[in-house]
Amino acid sequence: MSQAALNTRNSEEEVSSRRNNGTRLAGILFLLTVLTTVLVSGWVVLGWMEDAQRLPLSKLVLTGERHYTRNDDIRQSILALGEPGTFMTQDVNIIQTQIEQRLPWIKQVSVRKQWPDELKIHLVEYVPIARWNDQHMVDAEGNTFSVPPERTSKQVLPMLYGPEGSANEVLQGYREMGQMLAKDRFTLKEAAMTARRSWQLTLNNDIKLNLGRGDTMKRLARFVELYPVLQQQAQTDGKRISYVDLRYDSGAAVGWAPLPPEESTQQQNQAQAEQQ
C-alpha cells in the first residue's frame, strides 16, 4: 500500500473517531440534560405539593349515622393535632387514632383523603341499650362507653349495675330475666348484680325484687305466680306493693307502701262507683 493511500486511510479513521466521540459526548450531554430536568421538575413539583398554602386540607366531609357526634367534635379533635397538613403530608391514621381516643362513643372511624383538599371521615357510633353504673352506657355486645350526659338526657333506657368488668354478665342476666317477665307484661327498669352475684330488680311499676344468689330464674317464676294474689290484696287494702323478697325456699316477704295521692283518689272513686 502506498504512503498516500495510508495517509488517506488514517485521515478517514481520525475523522470517523472524532465523529463517534462527538456523538457519544452529545448523547451524554442530552442524558444529563434530561436527568437534570427531571430532578429539578420533581423537586419543584414535590415542593409545590408539600406547600400547605397550595394544598391545605380545608374541607371536611362527615358521613355515617350520628346521634351524639357533632361536627365541632371532629373539628376540634383534628385541630388538637396542630395545623392540618397537606394532601401529601397528612397521615390519616393519626387523625383516626385521635378521634377514637377523644370520642369514646365512637365504635369505628375511617379517614381518607380526597384530592385535592378534602378530608372524608366515616363514623360508626355505639348504639346503647342500657345505662351502666350511671356514668356509662352499654351496647348489645356488652361494650361500655361514655357520652356527655347532656346529649343523652332525653333517652329513656334501663339501668344496669354491677362490679367493674361484669357488663357482659349483667347484660346476659338482664336479657334472660327480662324475657321471662315480658311474658306477663312486666318490663325491667333496673337490674343490679353485687360482687357476690346477688340480684336486685326494679320493675316498670316500681316494685323491687330481691332475688339473692342462685336460682334466680326459679325465684322470678315464683314472683310471677304470686303477683296476682299480691295485687288483689294491695287493691283490697288500698296499698301498693313496694318490694318482694324472694330469698326463701318457698313463699316471699312482701313490703307494702301507701298509694300515691292520685292513685288513692282514683281507687276510692272506683270503689264508690262499684257500690252504686
UniProtKB/Swiss-Prot annotation:
GO biological process assignments: cell division; division septum assembly; FtsZ-dependent cytokinesis
Outcome of substituting L32R: No change in activity. Correctly assembled, interacts with FtsB and FtsL, but fails to localize efficiently to the cell division site. Does not insert into the membrane and lack of activity
Molecular-function annotations in GO: identical protein binding
A cellular-component GO term for this protein: plasma membrane
Residue ranges of the region described as Disordered: 255-276
Domain of life per record: Bacteria
UniProt keyword terms in alphabetical order: Cell cycle, Cell division, Cell inner membrane, Cell membrane, Membrane, Transmembrane, Transmembrane helix
Transmembrane segments annotated in the record for this chain: 28-48
HAMAP family linked to this entry: FtsQ_subfam
Record family assignment: Belongs to the FtsQ/DivIB family. FtsQ subfamily.
Summary of subunit composition and partner proteins: Part of a complex composed of FtsB, FtsL and FtsQ. The complex can be formed before its localization to the division site. This tripartite complex can be divided further into a subcomplex of FtsB and FtsL, which forms in the absence of FtsQ. Interacts with FtsA, FtsK, FtsL, FtsB, FtsW, FtsI, FtsN, FtsX and YmgF.
Function: Essential cell division protein. May link together the upstream cell division proteins, which are predominantly cytoplasmic, with the downstream cell division proteins, which are predominantly periplasmic. May control correct divisome assembly.
Name under which the protein is recorded: Cell division protein FtsQ
Classification of source organism: Bacteria, Pseudomonadati, Pseudomonadota, Gammaproteobacteria, Enterobacterales
